[in-house]
């Protein structure tokens, strides 16, 4: 059951250049376990609660009336900035595990390559289990423990179990919000 429709909003931030410049001023680290490509900043709730709250409210307002919600609505959210350079060409199909209800991605790269973005994927054949050894190659690949050739072979092997359903291009200041349990890359 999908909790939210895939939603795309252009012009997400009122001052995207300011947000981008702030993001680039922060320290970002790669994940030690290789859970994601590139590097991420610390949780925005800890380093800039005002921006974090503004962003969460803006996302929530895409689906619910939040004008009077300050007194009685609470949420748990985690967010930060992720920096991925152009050498990372294609993603690994995955879903966000855990209790997350939805995922939001806001693109802040001006003049991004038109082939980049986020796609929603579907399992090709639900009767086929993806072999564990294929799924388990993602983390060593993102930790650069595999050669680029072996990492690409592993990514293609995993992604072959899925078919692209929706594609959202990377456009400056565009947000995509979707159910966290949907497969995406």
Stretch-by-stretch model annotation:
Residues 1-91, 117-118, 124, 131-145:
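Non-heme Fe(II)/2-oxoglutarate
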